[in-house]
Amino acid sequence: MLQKREKVLLLRTFHGRTLRIVREHYLRPSVPCNSPLCPQPATCHNDGKLLSSDVTHYMVPDWKVVQDYLEILEFPELKGIVFMQTACQAVQHQRGRRQYNKLRNLLKDARHDCVLFANEFQQSCYLPRERGESMEKWQSRSIYNAAAWYYHHCQDRMPIVMVTEDEEAIQQYGSETGGVFVISFKNYLDNFWPDLKAAHELCESILQSRRERENESQESHGKEYPEHVPLEVLEAGIKSGRYIQGTLNVNKHRAQIEAFVRLQGASSKDSDLVSDVLIHGMKARNRSIHGDVVVVELLPKSEWKGRTTALGENDGDDKALGESPSEPMPTGRVVGILQKNWRDYVVTFPSIEEVQSQGKNAQKILVTPWDYRIPKIRISTQQAEALQDFRVVVRIDSWESTSMYPNGHFVRVLGRIGDLEGEIATILVENSISVVPFSEAQMCEMPVNTPENPWKVSSQEEREREDLRKTHLVFSIDPSGCEDVDDTLSVRALDNGNLELGVHIADVTHFVAPHSYIDIEARTRATTYYLADRRYDMLPAILSADVCSLLGGVDRYAVSVMWELDKTSYEIKKVWYGRTIIRSAYKLFYEAAQDLLDGNFSVVKDIPEFKDLDEKSRQAKLEELVWAIRKLTDIARHIRAKRDSCGALELEGVEVRIQLDEKKNIHDLIPKQPLEVHETVAECMILANHWVAKKIWESFPHQALLRRHPPPHQEFFSELRECAKAKGFFIDTRSNKALADSLDNANDPNDPIVNKLLRSMATQAMSNALYFSTGSCAEEEFHHYGLALDKYTHFTSPIRRYSDIIVHRLLMAAISKDKKMEIQENLFSNKDLEELCRHINNRNRAAQHSQKQSTELFQCMYFKDKDPETEERCISDGVIYSIRTNGVLVFIPRFGIKGAAYLRNKDGLVVSCGPDGHSEWKPGSLQRFQNKITCTTTGGESVTFHLFDHVTVRISVQTSRCHSDTIRLEIISNKPHMTPDTELLQQCSLLLKSDLVKEVTRSVEEAQLAQEVAVNITEDYQKYCQTKGRSLYTLLEEIRDLALLDVSNSYGI
């Protein structure tokens, strides 16, 4: 029977007054204990994760240990941890949402042997707070009391070790209950885990950092930064309009000088500002770090500054030579931080000379983060000299107003500087990507498909699903070598003369149950991560490449959308959604499908499904397939024309096709020619996504997951308009239809690169497409700008995207009749769905950034060992696409590289070009105009560079110990680079990118084989490489764009 108590809460108002609030608190005779030793598991309702039975004791951390040592408690070696509800709530209230979510994810993770015990709802465990008792003492008393009850509940069969940092608690409770031990966390590690070196090192690092903070707080220092305004004052200031709230974005090219705050929430609606707010200098940033949610006070207009327009190299100089800022913009200073965005940071120790200059016994070391946007971090360690050649991970603990730099602690070593695996690990950590293997508990939920026990369709599913195996010609069209097929198509004539178009998607949700271990893991990952030489899957291969993959000639479960179309106009008459069983008849590659569409039937010999047929059967089946492909293409043309009339955009993307040998290693990388079948498949997928979006919104108007693409801000188009104007084109950006038509008309017949660059600029001006819950936005905000659709979602790739899994569940709930209530119980509320959408959006950005950074890594490694003075491949044609005050931005079509080329160096010399076009550095000056820049020497020689001029560029690599290497471009001639294969250049060929990946990978493999003694490379490889073996295909498939000109997903398709 429930017992009711009253819980008193003391809350502070905006005005600083304290309110006493009394809430009802109900106690239960039993709550889940999640122990295998439970004498009454049915009474305790132990339905979730249980603690391991293979442990010598249970460990109960108190609230302070959970707060300070959570990263050690995350070690999978530490088993049998019982987190008390009291400790978890202390983390939530005192450390904020980020730390609390980290703890929640730890409890959900099947790889970690830990559980939550709701001690404050258990009748025998709950202790009311005594009058005059401090919150800290009550929390320790409650946790100890719950630990003692837990010991007796398990029939005194498992010792309990409570770990705490409270010496008084150790003295008071240490010998109070037999079988329940109370010790410090350091003693716990010393006694129970003496060989867990990483935990001991991390513990010492955390203790050292804490001691440094305590010492600093006792010393009297002058203020380096102003104190932050109290929270209640910040909230009142935001509400009154005095302050502005937004996210801090640091300019990575001028990280010491420039940062911008983009308005969000109430600030963006109530403010008259139409641009970001400039935060100039570290003092004005006031200890905020890139990504923090900050509160800003605007400075008087007389103190506003302009955005820097010069090229920068993060050299820390406040004023570049001849720098001329843009027009003054709103400028402010940070007065408070609402939410810190601290995470793990990859850093590098200073060189041995710098360490020695600080003194032989110096323990405080300033380490330099890999990310330019993060300030140096001060840590305490005696390993600085030993680790100076390694990339390591640190965490920030505090940033006091008396300190120039934040304080942090050392966490772990990643790998050697410059080593491929170490650099890849750096990219993963910097984007908060976890790539641990799938756990045993997760794999136990997976279906089995082996020669001894093959997977097959169940009789129950045959009864409940629509069986299309004998009635529909279903086939897939995918890139060459693709093995994880998640979409197939069908089209057929109906008896009434109309047509039926079908899109059939892998039924992943049949195998991934809501709230299962694999579902929680997929939700955490949110997407499959594609790097330049590998991939990390969202789902195990047994699903992604086997039983969920819609391979040819095998039975598979699918979720289908089928439309009845008018036979001539292709207007949609009706639509059907449902679960189906399909057997794909053909697994076609794009090129083969295009050949069949064009009437080139010689490709038939390369289609496996035709090989064993006699001539008559082959001809009949060929005619059937060709009719289907041509009819699909005709339907897709009609769909596309309809979207075009509404303003659908076609923006620039560079795609490549991977050619494989028999062993599935890369044989070649060929520029992907635009084929009409690409458009055909894409239009069918867009149609399915659109109609599913409408269906789930109609059924769940307040909790459907859709994808919106907001219209871009008009000021973001200014550079696009000016560049187009330089070529005599007018770009109308008032609507998506006007923009699409303008881009179509902006063609230079003598230089196709111009239109590609203009479309690229249009892409960069776009807002990001975002997932959202329909209950959190007004319906007029649902629109997808890039696709010109009123409602859109992602339904067609559940193998790779968790958003699609949610959409499949919503669709099943919308069309279900028999189990409607049961299915709907597993759906997210609007609040929970919106939180999930924020997580997925965040993970999508991380996936895009990591792919781009890994591509840049490979580009640098490819050019790093080549002599730019003699190597022919280091000289290439480039196109100027932007003018700056001290140089230009150049695009190199052959490699897809974008970068800065300086026209004035650090010595103040400017580029001068002779009659033959070759350049040299001479004293002189620069004069920048809107669409051109002129270099004039003191001798009177001048050369002018215009927008879209072709120049000859030398490519080299700017190396860095602390940061990633970067591509360096130098204009060596103001004339185009002449190559024997001009057609290759016109196609923006990325042919040499195959050499880039193959050569870098091969050189790394050879180096590893040559080294008999590797420095923990094996350990790092096992930790960060999910895909085994040397097959580059299993790592590279699905990569659509190895170039930096990555715009294929920028506008949200």
Swiss-Prot record:
As for subcellular location, the record says: Cytoplasm
* Phylogenetic placement of the source organism: Eukaryota, Metazoa, Chordata, Craniata, Vertebrata
Where does the record place the CSD1 domain? 233-309
Q: Which gene encodes it?
A: DIS3L
Describe the reaction catalysed, as an equation: Exonucleolytic cleavage in the 3'- to 5'-direction to yield nucleoside 5'-phosphates
Q: What's the protein name?
A: DIS3-like exonuclease 1
Family named by the database record? Belongs to the RNR ribonuclease family.
* Subunit field text: Component of the RNA exosome complex. The catalytically inactive RNA exosome core (Exo-9) complex is believed to associate with catalytic subunits EXOSC10, and DIS3 or DIS3L in cytoplasmic- and nuclear-specific RNA exosome complex forms.
Give the cofactors, semicolon-separated.
Mg(2+)
